[in-house]
């Protein structure tokens, strides 16, 4: 990633505006992924052979708990380490692996300007700034559409272990955004402020969603293959065909944001604040789904993915097959429907995030001088976040509570902090290192810190030194991911973490 920035700042006199900032920002980034994997076959494949006695352990391995009974126990790494296995490129047999190999490039040029202002309105001091950004984006992606060929290899018609040119795909797009912003602060009374902010923001879609790559899969299930060749039957019963791909033409996530807050600073260190916020999500990435003809794919130059003798079936005995219970005599050929679903990502989903937040920092010497140095800081955030299709917005908990008790005096500082948040949607790595959504259970975490700043001490030779000890997750809370039924699918245990810091400042 490369970034360059040119900025000019100038002060303004005899005007409502006190300072102006203009500039240009350029950045580019490149991301690639090579989904590489291998499977091992014995040198005797496709024939089998006995396990050499040198690799055997005494007795059998009890796998009855997995329904596998008792199996031969042997050192599985030994034959591999001795060169008795041959590694085979899994990408030649797994279309989804090749379809997850890609690169994405992006160039972003931003013109920006901001003006700071300070004035009075009806006797109230008003400060703030107004600004704009003009953002030009050029993005592109190249990759592969993983497809099984007539030789049953993936994109390797010549069996030369090179990806066929017909499987290569590339797309690019350009777009512009105008992003205004406004921040206003009004001092309605001594040390009391009303603040308002409005702006438009954008955020790139996930890199894996912007990839050009994709793949075609076929489910070798006779009940799906024996579905009538009509769109109505496919919509009712399903289909063995499926296609998945990213979308390099995706626009950024876009939001119009509004914030209103009241702040009261009743002490040099004490304040209370109440805020409300609203985010109008005018563009969000969603899952697209389209019925296509897999013998004439309009999304891939009319490609025909059907392979005679591989995608069809010869019935071995009389009977009814498929969800429609169609009768086939032994020896009959069953041909799958031409139609299936193409899944991809697209723009256009909308939603909103709204909520309120209460924040306070209260030095307890306001209660009693005997409590000088002690204090409490806390916040409570309530969020209602949802997309128009009813799905959740990643990273958003409905409730987040935090409370910190502290003591600060004469260079000595102690803090205990607790945070509680409800469950939230997130992303995690799934099979073949792919990204999938997951629900993270709510947690309550306890952290602590103790430190001493020697600049407050009488040891002049130690002035500038600060020593601190931090502890996080002191109650050893696990990180849990659950499925739609609330069953824990992943549990990660990190345990408490302790960090001892020595910082020295020379000025």
Positions of PLM-derived features:
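Surface-exposed extracellular loop regions of Gram-negative outer-membrane beta-barrel proteins
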Residues: 1-12, 19-23, 106-189, 255, ...
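Transmembrane beta-barrel architecture of outer-membrane proteins
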Residues: 1-4, 16, 24-34, 103-111, ...
């Amino acid at each position: 990633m490369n970034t360059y920035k040119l900025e000019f700042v100038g002060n303004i006199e005899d005007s409502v505006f006190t300072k102006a900032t203009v500039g240009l920002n350029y950045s580019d980034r490149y991301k690639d992924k090579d989904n590489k994997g291998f499977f091992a076959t014995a040198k005797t494949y496709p024939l089998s052979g006995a396990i050499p006695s040198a690799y055997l352990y005494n007795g059998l391995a009890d796998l009855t708990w997995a329904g596998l009974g008792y199996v031969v126990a042997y050192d599985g790494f030994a034959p591999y380490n001795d060169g008795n296995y041959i590694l085979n490129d899994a990408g030649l047999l797994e279309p989804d692996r090749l379809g997850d190999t890609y690169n994405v490039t992006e160039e972003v040029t931003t013109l920006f300007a901001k003006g700071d202002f300070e004035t009075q309105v009806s006797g109230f001091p008003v400060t703030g700034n107004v600004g704009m950004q003009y953002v030009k984006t050029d993005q592109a992606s190249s990759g592969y559409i993983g497809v099984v060929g007539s030789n049953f290899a993936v994109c390797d018609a010549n069996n030369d272990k090179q990806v066929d040119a017909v499987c290569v795909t590339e797309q690019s797009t350009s777009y512009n955004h105008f992003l205004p912003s406004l921040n206003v602060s009004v001092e309605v009374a001594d040390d009391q402020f009303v603040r308002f902010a409005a702006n438009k923001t954008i955020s790139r879609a996930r890199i894996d969603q912007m990839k050009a790559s994709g793949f075609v899969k076929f489910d070798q299930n006779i009940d799906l293959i024996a579905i009538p060749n009509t769109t109505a039957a496919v919509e009712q019963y399903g289909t063995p065909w499926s296609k998945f791909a990213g979308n390099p033409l995706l626009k950024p996530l876009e939001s119009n944001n509004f914030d209103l807050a009241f702040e009261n600073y009743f002490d040099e260190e004490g304040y209370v604040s109440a805020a409300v916020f609203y985010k109008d999500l005018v563009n969000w990435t969603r899952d697209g789904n389209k019925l296509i003809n897999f013998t004439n794919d309009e999304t891939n130059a009319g490609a025909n993915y059907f392979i005679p003798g591989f995608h069809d079936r010869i019935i071995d005995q009389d009977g009814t097959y498929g969800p429609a219970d169609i009768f086939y005599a032994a020896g009959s050929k069953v041909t799958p429907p031409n139609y299936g679903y193409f899944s991809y990502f697209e723009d256009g989903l909308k939603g909103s995030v709204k909520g309120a937040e209460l924040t306070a920092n209260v030095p307890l010497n306001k209660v009693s001088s005997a409590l000088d140095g002690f204090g409490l800081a806390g916040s409570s955030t309530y969020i209602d976040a949802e997309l128009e299709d009813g799905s959740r917005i990643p990273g958003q908990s409905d409730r987040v509570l935090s409370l910190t008790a502290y003591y600060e005096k004469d260079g000595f500082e102690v803090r205990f902090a607790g945070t509680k948040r409800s469950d939230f949607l997130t992303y995690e790595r799934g099979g073949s290192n792919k990204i999938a959504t997951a629900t993270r259970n709510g947690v309550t975490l306890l952290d602590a810190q103790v430190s001493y700043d020697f600049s407050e001490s009488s040891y002049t030779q130690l002035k500038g030194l600060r020593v601190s000890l931090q502890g996080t997750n002191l109650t050893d809370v696990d990180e849990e991911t659950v499925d739609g039924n609330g069953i824990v699918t992943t549990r990660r245990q990190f345990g408490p973490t302790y960090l001892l810091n020595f910082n020295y400042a020379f000025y």
